[in-house]
Amino acid sequence: MKKLLLLAATLTTTFFAKAQDEPKIKVTGYLEAYYGYDFNKPTDHNRPGFIYSHNRANEVNLNLGFIKAAYDTGNIRANLAVMAGTYANANLTAEPGVLKNIFEANAGVKLSKSENLWIDAGIFSSHIGFEGAVSKDCWVLTRNISSENTPYYESGAKITYGTKDGKFTATALYLNGWQRITRQNGNDKPAGGLQLSWKPTAKITVNYSNYLGTEGVDSVRVNRFYHNIYGIFQLTDKFGVTLGFDYGTQQKQKGSDDKNEVISPVAILQYKFAPKWAVAGRFEYYEDKNGIFIATGTPEGFKTKGYSLNLDYSPIANAVIRLEGKAYESKDKIFAREGAAVNANAALTASIAVSF
């Protein structure tokens, strides 16, 4: 922690000093504190194992806090952000040393004077899904199951092209793996992906993303192919709908044509009933019978429905106070309550998030 604080202080001081002479540098920050109450009362204060954001129960904690410096001249860009919080502890346990505290670190160069064509390399946010690590930017407080079990971040290089009217963007990615900053030891195969985003109007976004890579050391590695599609529709100034669908496959064993599958639809409705108030409801279903991402050891595997209701109050534009109730209902008894296996889990989560 001392190293992290020293790094953050040095980063902030350096970039603020440079910002006086170089206005193209911008320093921002984000902090979200939360309290989660799990009605199953886990003795280790951890939410179920497939949850990585807001994953601590029956305690007040920091989910995510970061300081970010961004540099952009129009032809060159770079971002560096260091972070702390339970989000970092849960998501970056496999990363070595201070990499556990890197939220973002990338640099890019514009490849064309006339076209919006860029190449970027480093550590950046995932290209999969409509929910990211910054809860304030999402319609609901906590993440859906598919967002929790696809990458929050990735490292590698990407080429991005955007049309001049901003309506279409295409990105091709070369990656070190599935949510990995460093490559898996013993695996020499790179991974990659594609993202296509279409915004015909300011109120509609349609996105398709995929990922193709391998898991495991080379001697036993299996292929993974994942697809994500979603649409965000702001139907009126007050009412919006988000629809998402994920489908993934993974070889059962190397050289086999047999595959395991994962499937997950999700729907979110948001209604802004007053200038500073909003309510949102979510339904989701996640099926991973053979444990590609969520292993249960039960006959039917992970087949779970999720329901949540969210209330938001934004006293000012850069802050939000939120309360969410969430319930999971599983086909098999995959949750624990007082030492017994049960089919359900419910939780209340409250948070305060501020960007600056």
Task: List the predicted regions and their residue ranges.
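Outer-membrane beta-barrel pore domains
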Residues: 51-54, 88-93, 98, 132, ...
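Outer-membrane beta-barrel architecture
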Residues: 22-28, 75-79, 116-118, 167-171, ...
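Glycine- and aromatic-enriched membrane insertion/assembly motifs of diderm outer-membrane
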Residues: 54-86
